[in-house]
Amino acid sequence: MKLDGRRESTNVDDRRGMGGGAKVGLGGIGGLLIAGLIYLLTGQAVDPSQLTGPMDSGQARTEFTQEEQELASFAKKILAGTEDIWTAYFSQYGLGNYVSPTMVLYTGSTQSGCGTGQSSMGPFYCSADQCLYIDLSFFTSMKRQLGADGDFAYAYVIAHEVGHHVQNLLGTLGKAHQQMAKMNAADA
């Protein structure tokens, strides 16, 4: 994916190096989503219970490798692309002004408007603070544990979380959660 010359979003709260320091695993909803994506793309079933990686506390860092810097830049450029597209779409279809989410980059764990976010949860969107949260080491886990490597797979994850933000802005996210709760209650 060629992103040279593309702008980086400024709607980013970079909390990497501020604590947490855990290795990411693909457990929880993130693991299920990625397992489903791999199945759709390859036809191979993946057991989500095997996607959980070990948690390992570490020290906070303020310096990042070249690869980590490039990955953060990539994520900011993908977010900027979603901002441009959704701003134009909202304008074109009379949906009002598009309010961009903030992307929070973190390592290990961080506080969100929805409680404590942990790497093992995978990337997530919190409607309470209109932020999407991602520990960039999730992409390393995607590559290592699922073979899902490359810019398009990484961009998909970010765009997916932005999609939840759009659902929230349009008022459909809450409705979807209500439907899921009804379905879960029916199964109980």
Label for each model-derived stretch:
Residues R6-G17, K23-V24, G28-A188:
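A Zn2+-metalloprotease active-site environment signal
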